[in-house]
A protein has these predicted regions:
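Mid-sequence helix-capping/hinge segment at a functional interface
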Residues: 1-41, 45
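A short acidic, often aromatic-flanked loop/helix-cap motif at beta-alpha or helix-coil junctions
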Residues: 9-12, 96-100, 153-158
Length: 181
């Protein structure tokens, strides 16, 4: 049994996940937590796609897309799945949490809206870039595995910051490289 911050996953389950979902450890496996509990917390797909373009130029990547089933989240998911990166994407919205947790544990890095997936990822011990757009910064930096990115033009974030369109993909990319290297 591996103890990972607050969530425990058996080593065998982690290895089974690698086989079941064809997780290639020679690639950079990234969880993209594209969902969010409200529309003001969901960074637009174009920002994720811009980041995907930047990171794909220098590293072979596999993107695990974590989101819920509501229509706003599904729009973001489908826009990403219709991009040129669709073949490098694996949507998680049809899987159970029990199946998703070992996938997250196998990721090199998570990049998530301030959503349940950012909290799960950090609790699993996976370094997590939290995209803080509309909630207090403490929600995205209370864990040592969390690395917040805030909207351009802001020094901090709080409720009603309304910054989802001002998350800079270059900042995400720079932070990802810093963490991955």
């Amino acid at each position: 049994m591996v103890v990972v911050d607050d969530i425990y996953i058996n080593d065998e389950i982690i290895l089974q996940s690698v086989k079941k979902f064809n997780i290639d450890k020679n690639e950079i496996n990234l969880l993209l937590g594209i969902g969010g509990s409200g529309s003001t917390k969901r960074v637009p797909s174009k920002i994720f796609i811009n980041f995907m373009e930047k990171i794909s130029k220098i590293k072979k990547c596999r993107f695990y897309l974590a989101t819920g089933k509501n229509s706003g989240e599904q729009i973001i998911l489908n826009e990403i799945l219709q991009s040129k990166y669709k073949d490098a994407c694996f949507p998680l919205d049809d899987l159970s949490i029990k199946e998703i947790l070992p996938i997250i544990k196998n990721c090199n890095l998570s990049i998530c809206n301030d959503s349940s997936f950012s909290h799960l990822s950090a609790a699993l011990g996976t370094k997590t870039i939290t995209l803080m757009v509309d909630t207090p910064i403490i929600y995205g930096n209370y864990n040592t595995k969390m690395f917040p990115v805030i909207p351009d033009g802001e020094e901090t974030v709080k409720h009603h910051t309304s910054g989802k369109d001002r998350i800079n993909p270059q900042k995400i990319f720079d932070k990802a490289l810093e963490i991955l290297n």
